[in-house]
A protein has these predicted regions:
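Conserved strand-helix element at the start of the C-terminal RecA-like helicase core
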Residues: 84-85, 125-145
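Inter-Walker segment of RecA-like/P-loop motor cores
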Residues: 3-37
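Post-DEXD/H (motif II) to motif III coupling segment of the RecA-like Helicase ATP-binding lobe
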Residues: 60-110
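Conserved helicase ATPase core of P-loop NTP-dependent helicases/translocases
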Residues: 160-181
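Conserved RecA-like helicase motor core of SF1/SF2 enzymes
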Residues: 177, 183-227
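Conserved segment of the helicase C-terminal RecA-like domain
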Residues: 213-248
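Conserved small/polar residues in nucleotide/adenosyl-binding loops
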Residues: 282-284
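Conserved ATPase-coupling elements of RecA-like P-loop NTPase cores
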Residues: 35-38, 59-71, 189-192
Length: 284
């Protein structure tokens, strides 16, 4: 908004917007150009080298599915003058081992996040997000909210960028006061939310069905409140409240440090099974 759309490019697995005059690039870690010699390659006029490189949410290096990409960027992504890695404090101990010469700093949340207990869907305050897992459950809750409360926007990772952005705009402009979403709202979206309610704390993570970890709950609950505006979180629709110690950890932003990052060689040998096994995912 400050620089204008002609100065900023966007690359994700779904979108590629590269204005000819762009000098700033926002992208997912999987899509970002790494290495000083890597060109964008589409004639958009973007530089091959970047003065500044920032990687956000580096705690995801501990995620089994995407972690190896974040670890690769931690090891190899560098700006000419400055490189910044942003994320949860839980990643700091491992980052200190990997980057012994880096300077570390921290910023406290400017607003208070507090637990508001359990509320029925019909009793949730306006400007709330209701978080569920599974397409059917999200649409079922959204339809109920539309009938009982007058309207709801829907945000899921599997929506097309255009549809997802339209739903976010619908909520942000105040056309509806409720948002029903998956944990896709936990990262990459800054929304004017006063309250986040979990309708479920169980998700399928690609390998198994499990409960959310306290850190994952905090990532979602932390969408409530913005800047100096306090926020609340709770449960709804039959979801059991978290344990008291989990609530306390979320309110105080206090979690166990990540013990392992995932790593995979960027030079995978597809010539033999032995070569693939030797370069398979490992913990570091």
């Amino acid at each position: 908004a400050k620089l204008g759309p002609s100065k900023v490019g966007l690359i994700t697995g779904e979108e590629r917007i590269l204005p000819p005059g762009a000098r700033y690039l926002c992208c997912t870690v999987e899509s970002m150009p790494v290495g000083f010699s890597m060109a964008i390659g589409d004639g958009a006029g973007l530089p091959k080298r970047f003065d500044f490189v920032a990687v956000d949410e580096v705690q995801l290096a501990g995620d089994r599915e995407r972690g190896h990409v974040f670890t690769d960027r931690i090891l190899h992504a560098r700006g000419i003058h400055e490189t910044m890695f942003l994320g949860a404090e839980t990643a700091a101990p491992l980052l200190r081992q990997m980057l012994p010469d880096a300077r570390f700093g921290s910023r406290q949340r400017m607003s208070v996040l507090s637990f508001a207990g359990s509320k029925k869907l019909t009793r949730l305050p306006r400007r709330s997000a209701i978080v569920a897992f599974g397409t059917a459950e999200v649409y079922q809750i959204a339809e109920f909210v539309r009938r009982q409360r007058g309207g709801a926007a829907v945000v899921m990772g599997r929506l097309s960028p255009r549809t997802r952005n339209a739903q976010v705009e619908l909520y942000q402009k105040g056309d509806v006061d409720f948002l029903v979403a998956t944990d896709a709202i936990g990262m990459g979206l800054n929304l004017d939310l006063n309250h986040v309610a979990l309708a479920s704390d169980i998700k399928f993570d690609g390998r198994k069905t499990r409960r959310l970890t306290p850190a994952e709950m905090a990532q979602i609950a932390g969408r409530a409140g913005r800047h100096t505006n306090d926020g609340t979180f709770g449960v709804t629709d039959g979801c059991e409240p978290p344990e008291p110690e989990v609530i306390e950890a979320i309110e105080e932003h206090r979690f166990e440090p990540i013990r392992n990052f995932w790593w995979r060689s960027r030079d995978i040998d597809f010539g033999s099974v032995d070569g693939l096994l030797a370069l398979s995912l490992i913990h570091i």
